[in-house]
């Protein structure tokens, strides 16, 4: 596993020199390197096209053995996300060369700015270096790669800005990878009790309070909907509450992050196929997202009050498990007809949302969940589906997503959709039928938000990947961590 220790420095003896290179204008302040690049361009072996990587091995007596040219395409077309992805690709070349120290020649992209350019580069390197090898018996020796950062046009006044950008990028990468680790843990080791213990350790490390409620305390709170989902498992449910108060002068303003915490989902009596169950350790991707986000927020001491709530349980089959046709209650008081036990996440979320509002006095709600396959069908694997009752709130999320490169898309929430989740024999039913599954699932949760500003994020697509991306590995991706942090961070400026 590669750990990138990124710091501002002058170019010293390193194994490799990493040069970001634009097609039309990159002037390397080294005649030998410029000559080599010009020869490569004449031979059309390297043009600087976006994503292109070429390695030059030094033959002269020099401290730097390898020069890695990283094509960024046209400077007029570059974005922060393109930078992240390009540098994520560069990790593979660094690994191939077995470089233990790399000097990154860094120049600001004018349209993006010094801090944002550097932050995107560091995130690409740090996020792209992630791997999950905990359970492999033949573990490769952990290699620590030091990346020195410098540029010929960075003056002394900009050094502090660079260091702040690096620190923030490394923290966001660290907490995103924390979320990835939580998702990647197998369900036989990551169940409600162990998740709760892990969150306590995380809270101690990053600086937020953690309170855990056991099954008896959950029952006292009248969270029947949440408890019903977990009844089939011998691993008892836990309600995990995280609190960070960074703005004690405005305690009436509390942003609640509510994450779906199904540490395993078999579908219950509405049983999934074997193929559908294989990745269901990832059904707590929403929980991982809010845990990662509050960790970053607390560590940066942002001036904001945040409550994170996770209703953690397993959805399994037993003689005690809930069944299709059951009618159950909820903490808020509404009754629910169960038509499908595999529509369980929303049942845990509604009690968690009610708890956040009534007990933690949340003024705004964001729930995050791997909720519906319909979200993947409609938007693909890379986009988060969003339902909201306040367009301005969604606007904040959208602007934050532009910064992080995590794609979001607002789904319609016309009033008529709400009719699809009304029951003839209870207040609501837990599925809305054949059509608009992502929308009706979100609106089901919306029935419990008590007129608070609310965002519902369905991350069923981006939370877990079965193919490697440029800076996202296979498995848990940590989707949502950086965007939730960025939304909170923008409110503090």
Curated annotation (Swiss-Prot):
It is an enzyme of class 3 (hydrolase). Mn(2+) 1 binds at residues 265, 342, 344. Keywords: Aminopeptidase, Cytoplasm, Hydrolase, Manganese, Metal-binding, Protease. One of its GO terms (biological process) is proteolysis. It catalyses: Release of an N-terminal amino acid, Xaa-|-Yaa-, in which Xaa is preferably Leu, but may be other amino acids including Pro although not Arg or Lys, and Yaa may be Pro. Amino acid amides and methyl esters are also readily hydrolyzed, but rates on arylamides are exceedingly low; Release of an N-terminal amino acid, preferentially leucine, but not glutamic or aspartic acids. Mn(2+) 2 binds at residues 260, 265, 283, 344. It is found in: Cytoplasm. Its cofactor is Mn(2+). Its main location: cytoplasm. Pfam families: Peptidase_M17, Peptidase_M17_N. Its EC number is 3.4.11.1, 3.4.11.10. GO terms for cellular component: cytoplasm. GO terms for molecular function: manganese ion binding; metalloaminopeptidase activity. The active site is at 272, 346. InterPro entries: Leucine_aapep/pepB (IPR011356), Macro_dom-like (IPR043472), Peptidase_M17_C (IPR000819), Peptidase_M17_leu_NH2_pept (IPR023042), Peptidase_M17_N (IPR008283). HAMAP family: Cytosol_peptidase_M17. Belongs to the peptidase M17 family. Presumably involved in the processing and regular turnover of intracellular proteins. Catalyzes the removal of unsubstituted N-terminal amino acids from various peptides. This is Probable cytosol aminopeptidase. The lineage of its organism: Bacteria, Bacillati, Bacillota, Clostridia, Eubacteriales.
């Amino acid at each position: 596993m590669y750990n990138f220790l990124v710091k501002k420095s002058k170019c010293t003896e390193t194994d490799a020199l990493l040069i970001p290179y634009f097609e039309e204008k990159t002037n390397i302040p080294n005649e030998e390197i410029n000559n080599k690049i010009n020869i490569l361009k004449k031979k059309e072996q390297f043009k600087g096209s976006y994503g292109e990587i070429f390695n030059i091995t030094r033959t002269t007596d020099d401290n730097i053995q390898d020069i890695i040219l990283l094509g960024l395409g046209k400077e007029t077309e570059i974005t922060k996300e393109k930078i992240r992805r390009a540098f994520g690709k560069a990790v593979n070349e660094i690994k191939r060369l077995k470089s233990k120290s790399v000097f990154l020649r860094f120049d600001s992209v004018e349209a993006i700015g010094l801090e944002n350019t550097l932050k995107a580069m560091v995130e690409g390197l740090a996020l792209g270096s992630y791997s999950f090898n905990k359970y492999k018996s033949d573990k490769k020796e952990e290699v620590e790669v030091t990346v020195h950062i410098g540029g010929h046009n960075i003056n002394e006044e900009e050094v502090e800005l660079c260091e702040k950008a690096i620190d923030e990028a490394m923290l966001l990468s660290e907490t995103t990878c924390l979320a990835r680790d939580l998702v990647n843990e197998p369900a036989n080791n990551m169940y409600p009790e162990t998740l709760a213990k892990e969150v306590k350790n995380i809270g101690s490390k990053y600086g937020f309070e953690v309170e855990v409620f056991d099954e008896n305390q959950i029952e006292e709170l009248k969270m029947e909907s949440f408890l019903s989902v977990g009844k089939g498992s011998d691993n008892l449910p836990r309600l995990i509450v995280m609190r960070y108060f960074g703005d004690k002068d405005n305690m009436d303003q509390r942003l609640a992050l509510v994450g779906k915490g199904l540490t395993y989902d078999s579908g219950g009596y509405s049983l999934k196929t074997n193929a559908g169950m294989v990745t269901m350790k990832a059904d707590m991707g929403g929980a991982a997202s809010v845990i990662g986000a509050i960790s970053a927020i607390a560590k940066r001491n942002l001036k904001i009050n945040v409550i994170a709530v996770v209703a953690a349980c397993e959805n399994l089959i037993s003689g005690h498990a809930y069944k299709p046709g059951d009618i159950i209650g909820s903490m808020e008081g509404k009754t629910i007809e169960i038509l499908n036990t595999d529509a369980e996440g929303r049942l845990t979320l509604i009690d968690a949302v009610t708890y956040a509002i009534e007990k933690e006095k949340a003024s705004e709600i964001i729930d995050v969940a791997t909720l519906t396959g319909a979200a993947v069908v409609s938007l693909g694997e890379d986009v988060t589906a969003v339902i909201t009752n306040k367009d301005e709130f969604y606007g904040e999320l959208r602007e934050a997503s532009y910064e992080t490169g995590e794609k979001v898309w607002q789904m319609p929430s016309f009033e008529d959709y709400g009719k699809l989740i009304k029951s003839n024999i209870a207040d609501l039913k837990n599925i809305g039928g054949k059509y608009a599954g992502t929308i009706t699932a979100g609106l089901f949760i919306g029935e419990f938000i008590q007129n608070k500003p609310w965002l519902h994020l369905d991350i069923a697509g981006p939370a877990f990947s079965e193919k490697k991306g440029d800076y996202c590995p296979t498995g848990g991706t940590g989707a949502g961590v950086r965007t939730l942090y960025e939304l909170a961070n923008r409110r503090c400026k």
